[in-house]
């Protein structure tokens, strides 16, 4: 049997999932992974919790490099930056110089990078992004070596809120600045974000609809200046979004999709033969609308890698697409969604109806009940459930159940008659998700 060489660019979740899958199916093949940092199989989602101090930085690697090298037989190159890609070859800058490697199959799994605004002072000591494990190391070391009381977080998305939480938990004075009129505006409808903003305002200085003009300081950061004021800052986190790393793919002539990420089919193949893409660098299909979307979320990235590796090794498997199911929290307030928001559904041309309910997560007589708010979005024409958003307590089982229901094409009637488990320690007899379906009507 002919021995093939697979080159994977990127040693994150998608890249290592791809490499591991190929080696499982084709152990005799040569699988090389090039990772620009010294971290492999890393978990950037854990950065806020390392900064908060509840997790050691070493835990940001799911497996140490030795597992992939010795147990799985992957030729892993760390601190190895791929600087050029050609048909059949890659050029890599490693610690001992530049080298060229050949490939039969190539996988782009080189993720995404922070979108850093081009403002004065962005390079001052004490200004950080929170994108990769080295950022967590740099932030924690800065906290250890410098007096930090005032922290400014620029951004209003998931990463911004999670980083703000980390510093609130550390007892810092936190200011959260965003140019949008709402936090999480692209992901949630206003009913949800109103509750989130009330919680934020109780614990930090929330400044919306403000444009950051510059960051000031002499030897290190001292303040952040916006078009509405200035805020003291001993440390600044810039969390204003990310963009897919498509430069190498463009150089090979790979098609870039309408989202700005690499176009792939449902086998994770790109427009160039024997070239694949997976994870945050790749776009995919939305399960409801069928449109091309870019949703850089960890569960999808891992599965994309699994699919890419399977197909490279000759085991055909298809990636169906995504719903954008996601969850986060700020202190004890959980925030999550799956499927389409009302705004997204209307933009797609759906005639929708919605419901927004408040419920308890256990019977009133059983201790530990938490308040949960749910918003449901339904297609008026078919009664199909299009999306669910949640905020409050114990939201995960509701969001995950809703994701399964939406994937299966449930109507509100299907949701209402789903036989969910009940016992007082776990849920009320009328689960909030069932109540939502009842209010949405069928």
Curated annotation (Swiss-Prot):
Query: What UniProt keywords are attached to this protein's entry?
Result: FAD, Flavoprotein, NAD, NADP, Oxidoreductase, Redox-active center
- pH-linked activity: Optimum pH is 8.0 for NAD(P)H oxidase activity.
Which residues does the record give as FAD binding sites? 13-14, 35-36, 42-44, 82, 280, 298, 422
Top-rank taxon of the source lineage equals Archaea
Catalytically driven reaction(s): hydrogen sulfide + NADP(+) = sulfur + NADPH; hydrogen sulfide + NAD(+) = sulfur + NADH; 2 NADPH + O2 + 2 H(+) = 2 NADP(+) + 2 H2O; 2 NADH + O2 + 2 H(+) = 2 NAD(+) + 2 H2O
Provide the residue positions that the database annotates as binding CoA. 24, 41-45, 62-63, 72, 302, 358, 430, 438
| First-level EC class | oxidoreductase
What is the free-text note on the cofactor?
Answer: Binds 1 FAD per subunit.
In this protein, the active site sits at 45
What GO molecular functions are on record for this protein?
Answer: CoA-disulfide reductase (NADPH) activity; flavin adenine dinucleotide binding; NADP binding; NADPH:sulfur oxidoreductase activity; protein disulfide isomerase activity
What Enzyme Commission number(s) appear in the record?
Answer: 1.8.1.18, 1.6.3.2
For whether the record's keyword set contains NADP, the answer is yes
| Notes on temperature effects | Highly thermostable.
Write down the required cofactor(s). Answer: FAD
The free-text function statement in the UniProt record for this protein reads:
Catalyzes the CoA-dependent reduction of elemental sulfur (S(0)) to produce hydrogen sulfide. Can use both NADPH and NADH, but shows a preference for NADPH. CoA-SH may act to solubilize S(0) by forming CoA persulfides, followed by the reduction of an enzyme-S-S-CoA intermediate produced after both enzymatic and nonenzymatic evolution of H(2)S from the CoA persulfide. Also catalyzes the oxidation of NADPH as well as NADH and predominantly converts O(2) to H(2)O, with a preference for NADPH.
Q: Which family does it belong to?
A: Belongs to the class-III pyridine nucleotide-disulfide oxidoreductase family.
Q: How does it assemble?
A: Homohexamer.
Q: What is this protein called?
A: NAD(P)H sulfur oxidoreductase (CoA-dependent)
Taxonomic placement: Archaea, Methanobacteriati, Methanobacteriota, Thermococci, Thermococcales
């Amino acid at each position: 049997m002919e021995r093939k060489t697979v080159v994977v660019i990127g040693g994150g979740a998608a890249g290592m999932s791809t490499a591991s899958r190929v080696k499982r199916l084709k152990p005799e093949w040569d699988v090389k992974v090039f990772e620009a940092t010294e971290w492999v199989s890393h978990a950037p989602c854990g950065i806020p919790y390392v900064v908060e101090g509840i997790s050691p930085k070493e835990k940001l690697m799911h497996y140490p490099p030795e597992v992939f090298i010795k147990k799985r037989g992957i030729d892993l190159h760390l601190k190895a930056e791929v600087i050029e890609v050609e048909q059949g070859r890659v050029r890599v800058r490693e610690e001992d110089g530049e080298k060229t490697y050949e490939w039969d199959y190539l996988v782009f799994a080189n993720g995404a990078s922070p979108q850093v605004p081009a403002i004065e002072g962005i390079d001052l000591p004490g200004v950080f992004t929170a994108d990769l494990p080295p950022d967590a190391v740099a932030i924690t070391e800065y906290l250890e070596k410098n007096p930090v009381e005032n922290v400014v977080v620029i951004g209003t998305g998931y990463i911004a809120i999670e980083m703000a939480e980390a510093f609130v938990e550390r007892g810092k004075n936190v200011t959260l600045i965003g140019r949008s009129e709402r936090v999480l505006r692209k992901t949630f409808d206003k009913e949800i974000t109103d509750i989130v903003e009330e919680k934020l305002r109780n614990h930090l200085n929330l400044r919306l609809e403000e444009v950051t003009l510059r960051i000031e300081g002499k030897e290190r950061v001292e303040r952040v200046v916006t078009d509405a004021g200035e805020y003291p800052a001993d440390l600044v986190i810039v969390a204003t979004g990310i963009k897919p790393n498509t430069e190498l793919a463009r150089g090979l002539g790979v098609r870039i999709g309408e989202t700005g990420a690499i176009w792939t089919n449902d086998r994770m193949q790109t427009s160039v033969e024997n070239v694949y893409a997976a994870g945050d660098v790749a776009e995919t299909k939305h399960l409801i609308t069928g449109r091309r979307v870019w949703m850089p979320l960890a569960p999808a990235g891992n599965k994309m890698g699994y699919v890419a590796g399977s197909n490279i090794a000759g085991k055909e498997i298809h990636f169906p697409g995504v719903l954008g199911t996601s969850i986060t929290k700020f202190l004890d307030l959980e925030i999550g969604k799956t499927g389409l928001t009302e705004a997204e559904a209307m933009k797609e041309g759906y005639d929708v109806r919605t419901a927004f309910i408040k419920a308890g997560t256990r019977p009133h007589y059983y201790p530990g009940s938490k308040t949960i708010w749910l918003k449901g979005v339904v297609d008026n024409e078919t009664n199909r459930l299009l999306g669910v958003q949640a905020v409050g307590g114990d939201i995960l089982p509701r969001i995950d159940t809703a994701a399964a229901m939406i994937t299966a094409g449930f109507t509100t009637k299907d949701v209402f008659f789903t036989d969910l488990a009940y016992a007082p320690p776990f849920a009320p007899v009328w689960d909030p998700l069932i109540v939502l379906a009842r209010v949405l009507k069928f």
